[in-house]
């Protein structure tokens, strides 16, 4: 099961309704952070997410609303006597900015921090991978893909019977080794299982103007979290951002299953923004609020709000 927890959904500056960008992915007990705007530690505390379970942080770019919460997060980890290393990934200049951050006050973390300055790469971590891709924001900036590894197909009872196999350690051996010798025959895993099942794919753009690489990397994604700062092109001015209509068009071309419109400018109310999205979007979409959670189960998304759960 995968959970996407929206800790901050607004753009540029926080207000009473929403914090600046931070997204937590919870997968098999691990928490992966994508962007850490100011106040992320408080948002995590409200969401009952432990910073000690965060091993990797992926920063899309170094505008303040996407990374200024990093210092408080690291200091909290230090106060809680963290020992595990922390890995921070980001675009060009990541090492310089993190080093400046750590040298800006009178504290030193008592755990190792590994900084990874990356371009377009494919990083493998056990049962999932993280892909990075370049986006267009006027400064070095990356989007990220979380891709769960594909899973084997389900064991087919009729095929197991055909080969004289039954539930038990022998199936575990077959799954681990890929093939076994049984009753004088070589049996491969694919001989007794159905089609492989696609792992879940989640794409987060960070800040960007519309670009072809987003469509390419978002192809057939289960969830595309695309910035849609503005409602109208004339509101955008010269900034490198995307409108709601443009984000919906990219999602349609990429054939994503669900679009999450993200990074709403503080000038728009939720109702105003939702009305425009309903007018322009002909793909399934949501407009997450702070503390909304999207849970991927049995091939579909379910959304709830953590604060409402606890009332």
UniProtKB/Swiss-Prot annotation:
Q: Does the keyword Zinc apply?
A: yes
Q: Where is the active site?
A: 65 (proton acceptor)
Q: Name one GO molecular function term.
A: 3'-tRNA processing endoribonuclease activity
Q: Which reaction does it catalyse?
A: Endonucleolytic cleavage of RNA, removing extra 3' nucleotides from tRNA precursor, generating 3' termini of tRNAs. A 3'-hydroxy group is left at the tRNA terminus and a 5'-phosphoryl group is left at the trailer molecule
Cofactor info, note text: Binds 2 Zn(2+) ions.
Q: Which InterPro entries match?
A: Metallo-B-lactamas, RibonucZ/Hydroxyglut_hydro, RNase_Z/BN
Q: What domain of life is recorded for the organism?
A: Archaea
What residues bind Zn(2+) 2, as annotated? 65-66, 207, 263
Q: Which Gene3D superfamilies match?
A: Ribonuclease Z/Hydroxyacylglutathione hydrolase-like
Keyword Isomerase listed: no
Residues bound to Zn(2+) 1: 61, 63, 137, 207
Q: Which SUPFAM superfamilies match?
A: Metallo-hydrolase/oxidoreductase
Query: A Pfam family name for this chain?
Result: Lactamase_B_2
Q: Which UniProt keywords apply?
A: Endonuclease, Hydrolase, Metal-binding, Nuclease, tRNA processing, Zinc
Q: What is its EC number?
A: 3.1.26.11
- Cofactor names: Zn(2+)
Quaternary structure (record): Homodimer.
Its family remark reads: Belongs to the RNase Z family.
Q: What does this protein do?
A: Zinc phosphodiesterase, which displays some tRNA 3'-processing endonuclease activity. Probably involved in tRNA maturation, by removing a 3'-trailer from precursor tRNA.
Name the UniProt record assigns to this protein: Ribonuclease Z
| Organism for this UniProt entry | Thermococcus onnurineus (strain NA1)
Per the record, the gene is rnz
């Amino acid at each position: 099961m995968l959970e996407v927890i929206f800790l901050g959904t607004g753009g540029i500056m926080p207000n009473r309704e929403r914090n600046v960008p931070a997204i937590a992915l919870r997968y098999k007990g691990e928490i992966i952070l994508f962007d850490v705007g100011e106040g992320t530690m408080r948002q995590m505390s409200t969401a009952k997410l432990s910073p000690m379970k965060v091993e990797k942080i992926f920063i899309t770019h170094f505008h303040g609303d996407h990374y200024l919460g990093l210092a408080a997060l690291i200091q909290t980890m230090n106060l809680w006597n963290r020992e595990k290393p922390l890995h921070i990934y980001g675009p060009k200049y990541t090492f310089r900015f993190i080093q400046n951050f750590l040298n800006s006050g009178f504290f030193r973390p008592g755990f190792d921090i590994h900084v990874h300055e990356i371009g377009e790469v494919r990083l493998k971590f056990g049962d999932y991978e993280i892909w990075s891709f370049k986006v267009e924001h006027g400064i070095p900036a990356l989007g990220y893909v979380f891709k769960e590894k594909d899973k084997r197909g389900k064991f087919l009872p009729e095929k197991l019977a055909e080969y004289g196999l039954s539930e038990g350690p022998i199936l575990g051996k077959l799954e681990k080794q890929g093939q076994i010798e049984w009753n004088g025959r070589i049996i491969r895993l694919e001989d007794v299982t159905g089609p492989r099942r696609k792992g879940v794919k989640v794409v987060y753009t960070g800040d960007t103007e519309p670009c072809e690489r987003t469509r390419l990397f978002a192809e057939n994604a289960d969830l595309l979290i695309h910035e849609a700062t503005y409602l109208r092109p004339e509101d955008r001015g010269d900034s490198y951002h995307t409108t709601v209509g443009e984000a919906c068009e990219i999602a349609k071309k990429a054939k994503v299953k669900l679009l999450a419109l993200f990074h709403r400018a503080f000038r728009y109310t939720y109702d105003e923004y939702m009305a425009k999205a309903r007018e322009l979007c002909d793909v399934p979409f949501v407009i997450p609020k702070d503390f909304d959670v999207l849970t991927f189960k049995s091939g579909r998304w379910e959304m709830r709000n953590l604060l409402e759960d606890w009332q």
